[in-house]
From Swiss-Prot:
Post-translational modification: Processed by the macrocyclase-peptidase enzyme POPB to yield a toxic cyclic octapeptide. POPB first removes 10 residues from the N-terminus. Conformational trapping of the remaining peptide forces the enzyme to release this intermediate rather than proceed to macrocyclization. The enzyme rebinds the remaining peptide in a different conformation and catalyzes macrocyclization of the N-terminal 8 residues.
UniProt-recorded name of the protein: Alpha-amanitin proprotein 5
GO MF terms held by the record: toxin activity
Key words, A-Z: Hydroxylation, Thioether bond, Toxin
InterPro entries reported in the protein's UniProt record: Amanitin/phalloidin
Sequence positions bearing 4-hydroxyproline: 18
Extra facts: The typical symptoms of amatoxin poisoning are gastro-intestinal distress beginning 6-12 hours after ingestion, a remission phase lasting 12-24 hours, and progressive loss of liver function culminating in death within 3-5 days. One of the few effective treatments is liver transplantation.
Top-rank taxon: Eukaryota
Length: 35
Protein backbone atom coordinates (compact mmCIF):
# COMPACT_ATOMS: atom_id res chain seq x y z
CA UNK A 1 0.00 0.00 0.00
CA UNK A 2 2.85 2.38 0.80
CA UNK A 3 4.19 2.01 -2.74
CA UNK A 4 0.81 2.91 -4.22
CA UNK A 5 0.49 5.98 -2.00
CA UNK A 6 4.06 7.08 -2.81
CA UNK A 7 3.22 6.81 -6.50
CA UNK A 8 -0.04 8.75 -6.28
CA UNK A 9 1.23 11.63 -4.12
CA UNK A 10 3.81 12.97 -6.63
CA UNK A 11 1.24 12.79 -9.45
CA UNK A 12 -1.29 14.70 -7.31
CA UNK A 13 1.33 17.30 -6.40
CA UNK A 14 2.36 17.74 -10.04
CA UNK A 15 -1.27 18.14 -11.08
CA UNK A 16 -1.89 20.84 -8.46
CA UNK A 17 1.50 22.60 -8.60
CA UNK A 18 3.34 22.55 -11.95
CA UNK A 19 6.31 24.31 -10.35
CA UNK A 20 6.63 21.57 -7.74
CA UNK A 21 6.23 18.98 -10.47
CA UNK A 22 9.17 20.49 -12.36
CA UNK A 23 11.30 20.31 -9.22
CA UNK A 24 10.31 16.68 -8.64
CA UNK A 25 11.08 15.84 -12.26
CA UNK A 26 14.50 17.51 -11.90
CA UNK A 27 15.21 15.51 -8.73
CA UNK A 28 14.18 12.27 -10.43
CA UNK A 29 16.38 13.09 -13.42
CA UNK A 30 19.33 13.78 -11.13
CA UNK A 31 18.69 10.56 -9.24
CA UNK A 32 18.66 8.55 -12.47
CA UNK A 33 21.85 10.28 -13.63
CA UNK A 34 23.58 9.40 -10.34
CA UNK A 35 22.56 5.76 -10.68
Amino acid sequence: MSDINATRLPIWGIGCNPCVGDEVAALLTRGEALC
